[in-house]
């Protein structure tokens, strides 16, 4: 039986900027990418999310991003390596401590937004983030874009890795995500997304934006919680996968 993890970006809500229904998503996903506070979220809200994930039996991951609250961490920042490493270590420490305070633990790291995308294509940035993760806890798994540079850098550094695909994002023929600035980058057809993910898990391919097939092997699928109809799309994706005989479970062995 095929097995796949479902992950979502959570802990990003604040009273002035609610973006997702975390409670609903935690009933669907098996791994939670919890905001570390730099791009979104508040200390209280992040702790609430960590506690809720723990109670739901969902694996907890840290979701560090650029220090860019205004743009939700979606703009690339040109930072000195030492600054970026300190920022990542700081963020990991925050969620690590909150998880510990509720009797749980962070088991993986998935960078956010522009940092994630930059790491997928830029070896220098990936090397800095990998160094930060190793400095905090070398047992943490780095979750990154399937086929991206970041996973190669982490593998060479001896950091555990897992490959990820995106349920609601369009792909280029080269296997990269289509920029959110481009038309058609985010998919909204629930049935289409569900079918795409079943095909990805069963056949290891996804249709690119130009209609060609791209090989994608992933251990986790991201179902975003901050897009319109996100909960319904995530639920439909899970239902389609289980209906196809796919087991849904955390990608980190022994996380739950």
Curated annotation (Swiss-Prot):
It catalyses: 5-oxo-L-proline + ATP + 2 H2O = L-glutamate + ADP + phosphate + H(+). The keyword Nucleotide-binding applies. Its EC number is 3.5.2.9. Keywords: ATP-binding, Hydrolase, Nucleotide-binding. Catalyzes the cleavage of 5-oxoproline to form L-glutamate coupled to the hydrolysis of ATP to ADP and inorganic phosphate. Forms a complex composed of PxpA, PxpB and PxpC. This is 5-oxoprolinase subunit A. It comes from Kineococcus radiotolerans (strain ATCC BAA-149 / DSM 14245 / SRS30216). The gene is pxpA.
């Amino acid at each position: 039986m095929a097995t796949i993890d479902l992950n979502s970006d959570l802990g990003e809500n604040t009273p002035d900027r609610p973006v997702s229904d975390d409670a609903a998503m935690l009933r669907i996903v098996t791994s939670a990418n919890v905001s570390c506070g730099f791009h979104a979220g508040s200390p209280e809200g992040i702790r609430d999310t960590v506690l809720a994930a723990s109670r739901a039996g969902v694996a907890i991951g840290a979701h560090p991003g650029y220090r860019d609250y205004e743009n939700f961490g979606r703009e690339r920042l040109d930072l000195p390596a030492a600054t970026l490493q300190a920022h990542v270590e700081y963020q990991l420490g925050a969620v690590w401590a909150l998880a510990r305070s509720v009797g749980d633990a962070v088991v993986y790291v998935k960078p956010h937004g522009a940092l994630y995308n930059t790491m997928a294509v830029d070896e220098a940035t990936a090397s800095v983030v990998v160094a930060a993760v190793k400095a905090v806890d070398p047992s943490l798994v780095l979750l990154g874009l399937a086929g991206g540079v970041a996973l190669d850098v982490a593998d060479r550094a001896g950091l555990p890795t897992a490959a990820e695909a995106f349920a609601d994002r369009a792909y280029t023929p080269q296997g990269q995500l289509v920029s959110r600035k481009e038309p058609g980058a985010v998919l909204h057809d629930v049935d289409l997304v569900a079918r795409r993910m079943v095909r990805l898990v069963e056949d290891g391919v996804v249709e690119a934006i130009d209609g060609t097939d791209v090989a994608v092997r992933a251990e986790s699928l991201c179902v975003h919680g901050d897009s319109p109809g996100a909960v319904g799309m995530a639920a439909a994706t899970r239902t389609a996968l289980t209906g196809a005989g796919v087991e849904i479970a955390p990608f980190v062995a022994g996380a739950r």
